[in-house]
């Protein structure tokens, strides 16, 4: 009995345990389903909210696109309207100028007709004078007979008396006629000259740009400023030393400034920095390598520019060295006016003027493009650009009219041809235009050039750069000719000569740099 009771208890316990397990498992499964359903609901809610946000952003983007499109269309319409307005204004001005020229031409034709009528009247007057002369001879004969008969004079004495009175009257009449015809000729020549100049200025419209003293280089990011400066300023010192240009790194975001009065140096330095920034390797040895390569490229570019100018202007054969000097003039300025732009303008105006006056247009154009060729050599050789231009054109056997134009446009020689006169007139037109030249800038540039010339004239000087707006001159001395002790003496001599020969505000710092380099290769 006890055994069965124990067995029953065990079975009952097992049944209870199994029941509890099944019930627990069912409860756990129910809770899991609830959690899963809740997670699904949350996921759907999140997905729905994300779709709402995405749709909202899509709507905002579309609205922004529509707004930008409307602004772009409005701006295009405004620009088109301004363009149409300016075009109409230019057409009106051109029509007015054309009308003025027609009026001037009609006036000239009218004056020519009046002159022709005057010539006819003069011929008639001459016929009447001949008739009066015959009558005079007849009366003279009768008077001589009377005088010789009644005044007891010889025929020769009476003739001398009459001729002396007649000579005085004729001299006065001759002087009056000379003054009158001189005035008529002067007025006619002045009107004709004004007509020719009006024709030239209306038929040629050249570009003009005032040269600045700085170049601005845009950088991709401000981090490059530190790399351009380099460790302890080595990179920027190398740049300034080899190029002779001030490199200004200030707080202006994304840009640096190059300052120099010499357009050629500034252009080389600008291209050098642009290539270094593009390459990414900025260090002293790399700077020197890129600088030399850019310098060679610039020389080749100047030769190509000269070739293109000669071809475009149809000047025929010209010596390669003269073409190179023409290309070099792109990097020269006079009174703030670009030398090459000025020469091209003079050449085109001179050709038009020479054509109006019956001269050789091609020869006038050639003389005009070469009239300031000496300015391409003044910074290296010094002296007058007229003397240098005459010397180089004589050396390369240019036409005598070209050499005469170089001398005559500054009054060194009399004008000897129509083409030379056309060049002188065109030079005056180009230079005398309001705003074309700036005297103060030219005086500053001349002082900078004089500072460099004084330093370059000293023995042992390899190169000299006037920097910091003329407040410092940096002199590169040859190590094989100048010792450390002589460097001090050289700096003092340059400073003393600058003090005695130039006028300048403040003071000028003279820095003499002497560097010795030894290069050897390990093989």
Swiss-Prot record:
Catalytic activity, EC: 3.1.-.-
Keywords: Cell membrane, Endonuclease, Hydrolase, Membrane, Nuclease, RNA-binding, Transmembrane, Transmembrane helix
Membrane-topology descriptor: Single-pass membrane protein
Cell compartments where the protein resides: Cell membrane
Xref: Pfam families: HD, KH_1, RNase_Y_N
An annotated GO BP: mRNA catabolic process
Membrane-spanning residues: 3-23
CDD domains: HDc, KH-I_RNaseY
Signal peptide: none
Keyword Transferase on entry: no
Major site of localization recorded for this protein: membrane
Protein name, UniProt field: Ribonuclease Y
The encoding gene: rny
